[in-house]
Each structure stands twice: as C-alpha cells, then as structure tokens.
Amino acid sequence: MTQPVQTIDVLLAEHADLERRLSDPDLHSNPDEARKAGRRFARLAPIVGTYRKLMAAREDLETARELAADDDSFTAEVADLESRVAQLDTQLTDMLAPRDPHDADDIVLEVKSGEGGEESALFAADLARMYIRYAERHGWTVTVLDEITSDLGGYKDATLSIRSKGDSADGVWSRMKFEGGVHRVQRVPVTESQGRVHTSAAGVLVYPEPEEVAEVQIDESDLRIDVFRSSGKGGQGVNTTDSAVRITHLPTGVVVTCQNERSQLQNKARALQVLAARLQAMAEEQASAEASADRASQIRTVDRSERIRTYNFPENRITDHRIGFKAHNLDQVLDGDLDALFDALAAADKQSRLQQA
C-alpha cells in the first residue's frame, strides 16, 4: 500500500472523534452541524471498516503461516488469506485516493436549449425528465426552481435542485457531476413534415450545492433583488402576488430566478442557495487551473460541435464521446436508466485520480 500510515491514523482519529460527537445529544440541537458531521462520518466509515478488515486478515495470515510451517494442511488457507489481504489492500488504497471534495453534496442542475429552436427546447425537456426519473429511482428529492417553457411545452431554460435524503459519502454530485456539457440529439422533430433527421443541441450545467449559503461569501450590497408574479407553463399565472424572486449578482452578472416555492421568502432563500452554488463553482474554477480545464466540458455556448454526448433516436443509441461509451438502449436511458453510463464515467474518473495521486 503506497499511502503513508499517518494518513490512515489521522482518519481513524477523526472517525473516533465524530463517533463521540454524534452520540452527544447537544450536537443534534444544531441540525446543520449534525448533518455535516453525519455526512463526514458516513464518508469515513467504509474506509475505517476496510482498514479493520485488512488488519484482521493480516493477523489471520500471520497465524496461518506459523501453522503451515508445521502442518502442510494450512498451505491452502495461507494462499486464500494472501489473496484476501491483497484485495483489501488494493481496496483501501483506492479509498484513500484523492476524492472530489464535493462528492457528498447535493446539486443544482440547469438545462438550456441551444441550436435547433423548438426541437432543442423539447430535447432540453427530455433531458430534464431523464434526470428527474433517475433521481426518483434513487429516492432523491427534485424541486423545479425555475422554468421558461417554449410554445410546444419544451424548456428554453430550467433550473432543478436535486437532493439526497441521507448522509451518504456518495451523494448526488458524485453521480451527476459528469453531466455538465453539450448534449446533442439526432431525430425527426415533431415539427418536421418530411420525416428528415435533424441535429440539435441542449446544454447542461451542474453545480455542487453548499450546505449553507454562509459557506460562500456573498455581500448583500452586491445583490439586486427583483420580485414579480410567478407564472406556470404557457405563461399561465399561478400566483396573484409578487412571490417570484430574481437575484442579480452585480460583480459577476450571474442571474438566478426562483418562482416555484410557496412564498417570496422561500423563493429568495432558494435563489440565494443557487447563487451560492454558482459563485462557489466560479471561485473554484478561478482558483485551480486544473479544475478549469476539467470543467471545459461545461458549456460556454450551446454549440452542436462541442458535444459530450449524442442521443441517436433512429438507432436507439447513446454515445458518450469522452470515454467512448456506447449503448443501444436510448429509450431506457431517457427513462432514467443511467447507472451503467454513470458507473463507466466514475471508473474513468477514479483511474485518472489514481494516476495523479
């Protein structure tokens, strides 16, 4: 194992401290702190468990070798234990490899139509439904924070909040962080009378959502807050009061709108959370040239040539161009069956992190 012993010792001490804190009733009087501690504990628990299994297997192996020196019947057990120790050692090394610090986070996801007009907006809505169905399969909570619909019910722009309900070390971000980029579709549009296949594109942006807005420094004087009446699909009014909120961050020009909560205060709170997520992502990009390069796949302009994935309807095929993944189950993918693709993307990301370690 290439990781220094000091690393696991530090994690063991932190795990023990968190276990003590989580058993203290006083901690749970602060739900935010309790949730944060619970998430960190959940992240460390599998590492500590694997380490303890490895230590036990090493002790068993040492005992088996001593017995095998006097009795050949223990030779097979030695071989089995050597294999188990090697397996656990590799597993622990993988667990200690550098991880994305946001893996346990919830996300804000934006879907934007691009080239292709009405067809692009319809495809953007298909992508949003795909992510919603995937989230439902995993028991996550999805909230549509804002939506601008097209004449045929597509999405010109939509913002979703996707949150897990537990404290898993592998949260929503760990699964969906690879979705940022341009998604291209090849199909016969509903507006096409000649039956010709057209190509259009929609863009997806994904941000890890800070647990608290306070984690991101936002100066109130840098904000312009506008309120207006919420509207439903097709422009139908759903609220007779000015409950929708639009926040503009003046230094960066970032604009966030939220109109689907029940009150102006709730919409403002959610809009601030989305703004915090976007500003956090921008700050991290600026702070790290490597992170900026990794996020080059996140769209700057929704151009069909800057694609990360193609959805080919005539061939029922999905292709992820970053890792060469291909599958002929597009209908199932659009119904939220994304785990095979996400597993492949996660494996490629893990391999990259191990090489950089």
UniProtKB/Swiss-Prot annotation:
According to the UniProt record, list the residues that bear N5-methylglutamine.
Answer: 236
**Pfam families, sorted:** PCRF, RF-1
Q: Where in the cell is it found?
A: Cytoplasm
Q: Which UniProt keywords apply?
A: Cytoplasm, Methylation, Protein biosynthesis
Q: Which GO terms describe its cellular component?
A: cytoplasm
- Which modifications occur after translation, per UniProt? Methylated by PrmC. Methylation increases the termination efficiency of RF1.
Give the transmembrane region(s).
none
Family the entry assigns: Belongs to the prokaryotic/mitochondrial release factor family.
UniProt function note: Peptide chain release factor 1 directs the termination of translation in response to the peptide chain termination codons UAG and UAA.
Q: Which HAMAP family match?
A: Rel_fac_1
Protein's name in the database: Peptide chain release factor 1
